[in-house]
């Protein structure tokens, strides 16, 4: 007998590793040298290049293929105001769709702020205004 939608949905979301998205390394990390290039001291070099030219961030970081899905949980897919944490499965689901259909990596960010102006200020503080709505070809 088929499970009802609630049981099937809860099983889907709880099976295996929790969540629907993860961060996976794109560079080698198996040796001491790899780790020192990935972090300290090697990471300083791309930082200094980006400091000189912000466009270099697209060459040395995931910036060109990474978006944030940001929500405060006040208007979640017909569920209404369920709060930031309760909306997280929806934000992860959006991240999954971005990844499988467009190859775009996502960080979901849930913000506990219901005041619209404060929420906007928080998001503005996170965003790099030079890259908002911008495509790099």
Regions found by a protein language model. Name each.
Residues 1-134:
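N-terminal ligand-binding/catalytic initiation module
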